[in-house]
């Protein structure tokens, strides 16, 4: 790990919580998380699998319910199998305390409750691709959790060589960018951090301007370049030269699509995005752009920063 810059400390996971389904999607979760804990100092990790509520299963399945329930019985054997599978896929890390548990209940409610109980500062969850209601649990968890949430699609690959950080110059953007820099400080081989701003071309018909469209586009780009430099020099002083900036003018609706297209075409390994705060109103919306990125993303891990 390289020496820390005095402004932003290297990233550290004090208490991680990893949600597992005990199925195929766990492979990519454990693969990426094993890479991450090999780079980032990690204190404690709590692995949790939530079974559906048995009384609900019984009502749906009737007489066959008891047999199904017996197959999902919460006992030491299930936890032991879970532990064996995790340890077989992850390397041992000195100083990292690991705990395993299996609980019954509503998956979202149980994950949120346990994340609060263990005071998780990072929640990790997988996301299936190509299914109906794509990423609903992951999206809702990212929306309601108070901790940073890492969503790992089942087509993801382990490794971070290029981080994409979409910004809109808001406070949430600052948190996301500082987190990306902090994470980069912990990597043995620093990644390229691309600070991405998607900006919209105004409707020129409502303005009385004495410029051609081409002249206006150049002026708009210059203004955003200056805004980007001012933002970086103010919010992350000393790091400007370590960051790559990219401005993209939005010509069609859908900022999230622009973000995904750029991240895919440019080989992004991790998207780091800001989210809304924790007030009752803000908890209702994670942020439309962030939610849409999560919904359409099937291959790039996304870290939602709170």
Predicted regions, residues:
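Gly/Ser-rich helix-loop-strand patches that form or flank binding pockets
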Residues: 1-7, 12, 39, 110-159, ...
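Structural beta-alpha unit
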Residues: 1-11, 35-37, 52, 69, ...
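Small/aliphatic-rich secondary-structure junction motif
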Residues: 2-68, 162-217, 221, 233-241, ...
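Amphipathic coiled-coil/heptad-repeat helices and related helical stalk/stem segments
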Residues: 29, 107-108, 134, 176, ...
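Short, charged helix-to-loop "capping" segments that act as catalytic/coupling loops
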Residues: 34-44, 131-133, 155-157, 182-192, ...
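A structural preference for short, hydrophobic beta-strand core positions in alpha/beta folds
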Residues: 47, 99-102, 151, 195, ...
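Short, surface-exposed alpha-helical segments at coil->helix boundaries
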Residues: 72-87, 221-233
